[in-house]
Amino acid sequence: MASLVVIVSLLLAAFASPLLETAHSYNVTAPRVSLNPIDACWRRNPKWATNRQALAHCAVGYGKAAIGGKNGPIYVVTNPSDNPTRPSPGTLRYAVSQPKPLWITFARDMVIVLKSQLMINSYKTIDGRGAKVEIANGPCLRIRQVKHVIIHGISIHDCKADPNGMDGDGIRVFQSTHVWIDHCFLSRCHDGLIDVIVSSTAVTISNNYFTQHDKVMLLGHDDSYMGDKDMRVTIAFNTFGPGLIERMPRVRRGYAHVANNRYEKWQMYAIGGSANPIIFSEGNYFVAPEKRSSKQVTKRMMAGPDSKRWKWGTSRDVFMNGAFFGPPGVIVRPLYKGGEGFRVAHGSLVPSLTSSAGPLRCYVGRIC
């Protein structure tokens, strides 16, 4: 009888705990898992592969209107090679450089090592569903002065600096609008994992798995750049996993709605900012590190006495292992419009809602 109890306990623990290995090997989620509003929009449909563009209706938050390549044909990447000066048809670089809308998919599993940063044109979707796609060990993605880009279901890691100027970010969003980054895995890049800078806005970052990195996510170019005061970013349903140090995110001047994310033992701080940004932390799940001096969730950088009046609010967050938000300020709720709003759950539900963060292992004819 005792051995039976032990076996049952081990099985329950295995199903209840999200594993780092799952994030690396792509998630296969049990059908009974609680789905967040984005995933509930499409994952229950076993015929997802026959209408891939339906995904474009599923974003929430400030990036809700991002349509990517919804109004264009499917383009299948068949060749993982890269030639920055003369991209070959069938390669990812060839697809993203086209002027027309495209919904880009992949014929098989592949690792793409880029020789220079991948400049993504407007009205493009990179859709990794149905294949295990990695962009790694070279320069990575740049979304510059474009609009309507969706990046879904790929792994981006070990990104290098580009000799032609990119710092080595996983994804850099520069002067761009209507961008949605969903169900990606990001880790170990030379600079940031995701930067949203220089007047970029209308961005949603959701369902991603971040791990093993220092400066995770930057929103806003620098403290003196006033153009970012109109920046609006939604960060929802992500897992900030082991080995992260800071910037989850760091915000400058603009507005960030940080909702229903899971934070696992950051090393310095989780959410920070400078230059008087507005931050609303809602329904997150914070597990503090063991180090006593790092248990505060927030950090105000280069801040004088006025920083105590910054509008950094917390609502329905869960604080574990001694985590605490810091001096709470006025709550400024997001002014969503046109269907951008979504139901934010209490932080206690976040372990379930984020259990499928990262790329999903999807098979044609089956629910993801």
Curated annotation (Swiss-Prot):
UniProt KW Calcium keyword: yes
Source species: Arabidopsis thaliana
Catalyzed reactions per annotation: Eliminative cleavage of (1->4)-alpha-D-galacturonan to give oligosaccharides with 4-deoxy-alpha-D-galact-4-enuronosyl groups at their non-reducing ends
Name of this protein: Probable pectate lyase 4
Leader sequence segment: 1-25
Entry keyword set: Calcium, Glycoprotein, Lyase, Metal-binding, Signal
Assigned protein family: Belongs to the polysaccharide lyase 1 family.
Pathway(s) this gene product operates in, as recorded in its UniProt entry: Glycan metabolism; pectin degradation; 2-dehydro-3-deoxy-D-gluconate from pectin: step 2/5
GO molecular function (one): pectate lyase activity
Stored Pfam families: Pectate_lyase_4
Cofactor note as given: Binds 1 Ca(2+) ion. Required for its activity.
Binding-site residues, Ca(2+): D167, D191, D195
EC number: 4.2.2.2
Source species, domain of life: Eukaryota
Keyword Calcium assigned: yes
Cofactors demanded by this protein: Ca(2+)
Catalytic site: R247
Record field: transmembrane: none
InterPro entries recorded: AmbAllergen (IPR018082), Pec_lyase (IPR002022), Pectin_lyas_fold (IPR012334), Pectin_lyase_fold/virulence (IPR011050), PEL (IPR045032)
GO biological process: pectin catabolic process
Glycosylation sites recorded in the entry for this protein: N27
Source organism phylogeny: Eukaryota, Viridiplantae, Streptophyta, Embryophyta, Tracheophyta
